[in-house]
């Protein structure tokens, strides 16, 4: 359908406005009073913030139709993963730099009791 993405944007803006109003309705507690009074006010404020957060999540899921739980990330089988350090192994300053590599050829990661060093 043509023009439906604009409706989706409007729904998102409406949801964000509602959530903003909720957060603005709960200002931080005042720093006046005894230590116990301040602690109680902060505790109640944090409880209200948690409620607002859960309400905001429900608003977003209702307006945007998102699922409650995130979609699990699909990972390759553990047998196919190995460390590949054939390029510049041990060069100073480059450890942890670059993209992780997945090698499909070698199903053996490490033999029991052996360590491979480059």
Curated annotation (Swiss-Prot):
Q: Where is this region: Homomultimerization?
A: 18-26
Task: Quote the biased-composition stretches of kind Polar residues, using this chain's numbering.
Answer: 92-112
Q: Name one Pfam family in it.
A: REV
Alphabetic keyword roster: AIDS, Host cytoplasm, Host nucleus, Host-virus interaction, Methylation, mRNA transport, Phosphoprotein, RNA-binding, Transport
Per UniProt, the short sequence motif Nuclear localization signal and RNA-binding (RRE) occupies residue numbers: 34-50
Disulphide bridges in this chain? none
| PTM entry text | Asymmetrically arginine dimethylated at one site by host PRMT6. Methylation impairs the RNA-binding activity and export of viral RNA from the nucleus to the cytoplasm.
Question: Which Gene Ontology cellular-component terms appear in the entry?
Answer: host cell cytoplasm; host cell nucleolus
| Record motif Nuclear export signal and binding to XPO1, residues | 73-84
The principal location of this protein is: host cell
Q: Which residues lie in Basic residues bias regions? A: 36-49
| Location of region: Disordered | 23-49, 89-118
Q: Where in the cell is it found?
A: Host nucleus, Host nucleolus; Host cytoplasm
User: Can you provide one Gene Ontology molecular function annotated for this UniProt record?
Assistant: RNA binding
Task: Point out residues bearing the modification Phosphoserine.
Answer: 5, 92, 99
One record GO biological process: viral process
Q: What is known of its domains?
A: The RNA-binding motif binds to the RRE, a 240 bp stem-and-loop structure present in incompletely spliced viral pre-mRNAs. This region also contains the NLS which mediates nuclear localization via KPNB1 binding and, when the N-terminal sequence is present, nucleolar targeting. These overlapping functions prevent Rev bound to RRE from undesirable return to the nucleus. When Rev binds the RRE, the NLS becomes masked while the NES remains accessible. The leucine-rich NES mediates binding to human XPO1.
What else is noted? HIV-1 lineages are divided in three main groups, M (for Major), O (for Outlier), and N (for New, or Non-M, Non-O). The vast majority of strains found worldwide belong to the group M. Group O seems to be endemic to and largely confined to Cameroon and neighboring countries in West Central Africa, where these viruses represent a small minority of HIV-1 strains. The group N is represented by a limited number of isolates from Cameroonian persons. The group M is further subdivided in 9 clades or subtypes (A to D, F to H, J and K).
What does the similarity note say?
Belongs to the HIV-1 REV protein family.
* Record function comment: Escorts unspliced or incompletely spliced viral pre-mRNAs (late transcripts) out of the nucleus of infected cells. These pre-mRNAs carry a recognition sequence called Rev responsive element (RRE) located in the env gene, that is not present in fully spliced viral mRNAs (early transcripts). This function is essential since most viral proteins are translated from unspliced or partially spliced pre-mRNAs which cannot exit the nucleus by the pathway used by fully processed cellular mRNAs. Rev itself is translated from a fully spliced mRNA that readily exits the nucleus.
The entry describes its oligomerization and partners as:
Homomultimer; when bound to the RRE. Multimeric assembly is essential for activity and may involve XPO1. Binds to human KPNB1, XPO1, TNPO1, RANBP5 and IPO7. Interacts with the viral Integrase. Interacts with human KHDRBS1. Interacts with human NAP1; this interaction decreases Rev multimerization and stimulates its activity. Interacts with human DEAD-box helicases DDX3 and DDX24; these interactions may serve for viral RNA export to the cytoplasm and packaging, respectively.
This protein's name: Protein Rev
| Organism for this UniProt entry | Human immunodeficiency virus type 1 group M subtype D (isolate Z2/CDC-Z34) (HIV-1)
